[in-house]
C-alpha cells in the first residue's frame, strides 16, 4: 500500500468503517484510491455503466458530467447501502478496519457475492485472518484476472488484517 494511502486510512479510523472504506476507494487526494474517478459515465471492464468512484445503477445519467460533490454524495449513499446490506450477516465482532476493508470489497463485488462467500463464513467462524486471506481469490472480472484487482485486494487485505497480527 502506498504510504500516503496508509496514512489517510489510519487518519480515517476514528470516523468508522464507512470513513475507512471511503478513503480506500477515493484515496488521499480524492482521485487516487482503489476505484479512481471518472466524472463522465463509462462502461467498465464487464460492460456496466459506471461513474464517479465506481457508482453503478439506473440513476446514472448518460451524457452528464458529474461534480466532485455529486460523486462524494453518491459514494456516501452507496457505502451506507453496503453497510445495511452486509452488517446483518456479520455475526461476530470485528475491528472497524476489517469492516472498512469489507465495505470497500463489497462495494466492488456486490453484497450478493459476499453473502454466499467463504470469506463471510470464515468471519462468522471467528477466522478473521482466513477471511482476509480470501480477498486474494477475488481478482477476476469477465473471466479474466486483472492486475488492478490483485493490487486492490492486497490493499484491502492489509487493512482487513490491521489489529489481527
From Swiss-Prot:
Q: What does this protein do?
A: Essential for lysis of bacterial cell wall, by showing cell wall hydrolyzing activity. Exhibits lytic activity against E.coli and S.typhi cell wall substrate.
Per the Swiss-Prot or TrEMBL record, the active site comprises 35, 44
- Share any extra remarks: Encoded by the cryptic lambdoid prophage DLP12.
Q: Does the keyword Transport apply?
A: no
GO terms of molecular function: lysozyme activity
What the record says about family reads: Belongs to the glycosyl hydrolase 24 family.
Q: Which InterPro entries match?
A: Bacteriophage_GH24, Endolysin_T4_type, Glyco_hydro_24, Lysozyme-like_dom_sf, Lysozyme_dom_sf, SAR_endolysin-like
**EC number(s) stated in the UniProt entry for this protein:** 3.2.1.17
UniProt keywords (A-Z) are: Antimicrobial, Bacteriolytic enzyme, Glycosidase, Hydrolase
Changes seen on gene knockout: Mutants are unable to form wild-type biofilms, which could be due to altered peptidoglycan metabolism.
Matching SUPFAM superfamilies, A to Z? Lysozyme-like
Q: Which Pfam families match?
A: Phage_lysozyme (PF00959)
Q: Which organism is it from?
A: Escherichia coli (strain K12)
Q: What HAMAP family does this protein's entry cite? A: ENDOLYSIN_T4, SAR_ENDOLYSIN
Per its record, the protein catalyses: Hydrolysis of (1->4)-beta-linkages between N-acetylmuramic acid and N-acetyl-D-glucosamine residues in a peptidoglycan and between N-acetyl-D-glucosamine residues in chitodextrins
Classification of source organism:
Bacteria, Pseudomonadati, Pseudomonadota, Gammaproteobacteria, Enterobacterales
Q: From which domain of life does this come?
A: Bacteria
The enzyme's main class, written as a single word, is hydrolase
Which CDD domains does the entry link to?
endolysin_R21-like
Q: Which GO terms describe its biological process?
A: cell wall macromolecule catabolic process; defense response to bacterium; peptidoglycan catabolic process; viral release from host cell by cytolysis
Q: What is this protein identified as?
A: Lysozyme RrrD
Amino acid at each position: 500500500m502506498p504510504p500516503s494511502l496508509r496514512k489517510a486510512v489510519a487518519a480515517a479510523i476514528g470516523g468508522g468503517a464507512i470513513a475507512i472504506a471511503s478513503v480506500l476507494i477515493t484515496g488521499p487526494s480524492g482521485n487516487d484510491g482503489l476505484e479512481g474517478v471518472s466524472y463522465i459515465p463509462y462502461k467498465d471492464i464487464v460492460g456496466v455503466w459506471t461513474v464517479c468512484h465506481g457508482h453503478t445503477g439506473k440513476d446514472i445519467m448518460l451524457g452528464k458530467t458529474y461534480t466532485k460533490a455529486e460523486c462524494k454524495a453518491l459514494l456516501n449513499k452507496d457505502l451506507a447501502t453496503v453497510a445495511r446490506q452486509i452488517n446483518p450477516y456479520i455475526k461476530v465482532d470485528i475491528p472497524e478496519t476489517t469492516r472498512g476493508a469489507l465495505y470497500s470489497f463489497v462495494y466492488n463485488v456486490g453484497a450478493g457475492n459476499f453473502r454466499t462467500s467463504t470469506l463471510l463464513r470464515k468471519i462468522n467462524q471467528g477466522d478473521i485472518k482466513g477471511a482476509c486471506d480470501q480477498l486474494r481469490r477475488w481478482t477476476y472480472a469477465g473471466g479474466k484476472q486483472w492486475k488492478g484487482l490483485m493490487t486492490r485486494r492486497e490493499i484491502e487485505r492489509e487493512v482487513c488484517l490491521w489489529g489481527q497480527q
